[in-house]
Amino acid sequence: MKNKIIDILSENIEQMSKEDIAAALEIPKKTDMGDFAFPCFRLAKAFRKAPNMIAEELTAQINEKGYDIFDKVVNVGAYINFFLAKEAFAKEIMKTVDTADFGAGTEGEGKTVCIDYSSPNVAKNFHVGHLRTTIIGNSLYKIYSKLGYHVERINHLGDWGTQFGKLIVAYKKWGSKEAVEENGIDELMKIYVKFHQEAEKDDSLNDQAREWFVKMEQGDEEALAIWQWFKDISLVEYKRIYKLLGMDFDHFTGESFYRDKTHEVVEKLQEKDLLVESEGAHIVSLDEYDMAPCLIMKKDGSSIYATRDLAALLYRKRTYNFDKCIYVTGLEQKLHFAQVFKVIELLGYDWYQNLVHVPYGLVSMEGGKLSTRNGNVIYAEQILHEAIEKIHEIINEKNPDLPNKEEVSRQVGIGAILFNDLYNQRIKDVIFNWDKILNFDGETGPYVQYTYARCASVFRKVGAVELPAEVDYSVLTDDATMNLLKDLTRFPQVIKEAAEKYEPFMIARFAVSVAQHFNKFYHDCQINVEDENVKMARLKVVDVTMRVIKSALDLLGIECPEQM
């Protein structure tokens, strides 16, 4: 229906493209202002008239042609307000949303997107800060896949660097094989924290750490064996968390994968005369771009993560021939990626324009940024299990006879954490507030999941029923139903905008809006009635709503329990 209005406006406005008309067309917040509204401000220059006069003339022009899809078309100030013929509108919407792939797009067909996300630092616990990149990245993967893109999910593990030199020193001085095998990453974290405490008093420990990392880079057998052991232990924990979240990756190619590929970066920089020596190290100067220099090699000849990121980009372009490469990391890495992308540009690659940094805000509980070095860390697994346990307690209190309580608790608990992370713009900080996150009545994951379960319960109460292809659309013209149907039609556009802006929160907000509109419909419109026409039409509305909610939550990585 929106496309029909765009076509009608396009017929009557030669001075504006269809794309611009589509972008300008609005859904008014108040129903008494119509179903759609078109502002005429942008036409003032072309028409050389006041916007309200343009609106008046165009309204008269449209009414004169007598389009049967409108109940009426009026102008209010500089706006043209369209009131649709409700039965025709209801039919059009139901035909649109009642499709298996509603919301899916084709703009990504034949295109590849690489998304680099999660990427925890090996030998360190997976904390809630890592949850943000994992949750946002997974949602972007699903959103881009929905639009037809082929997506490569890359977990660029932080499995190389001087921190491993520190950890090897710490292990040799204060660790034991038995303790590490028994306690895993917790033990590695314990000795890593001790290293930093001791290094503040004895700087020679840092020198020893650098020496061990150089040994790693030179292929020292002992150093690499210890490093690989640390990595294997870490991956067991990380994969356990990904399984709990219901997520996976196509590649676990961390920084170490590129350690033998950094020479290509150095050679290309030398060929372009971009590599300069500075205090013994090698850098790319970015002064003229108002950026700090990009460090390529340290004094001791060891590589740095910028070098490995550059090597990774060259490898990914060659291997996947991506149309876009997205990095989902904290805001504190903004400069790092600006430098890396600028170096790619200076190397003469025009695909630097297809490199995107998607930053996000911090995570805290009762205030305070998370830190690894002093041991003041909130672990992801701890948070996830706590959410599951708290939901389990709520279910035991409110619905103790619920089947599959354990599985429902997992779905709702994990879903609550994911939804809380994705409900606001990613750049905003996330603060854990259990009462808010687990609220079944607020703008939360459990609320949307409960709405889905409510839809499912309608069909359980009705029993086995085969929904007809056509229904009596005249019974779907009340305000509650129309508002719900109009909201559902936004889904494809919301997905596109979420992809364009790298903002999954748009999907989360849409899901809440649909849930709210459905619950108003559920309250106002009795469904299981004797009149078969009314019953079937309203069941059809429940069915399409249920499918859209499930699809929207899936784009956020959230499952939908049938009962709650």
Say what each PLM segment does.
Residues 1-90, 99, 104-564:
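Non-catalytic interaction-recognition regions
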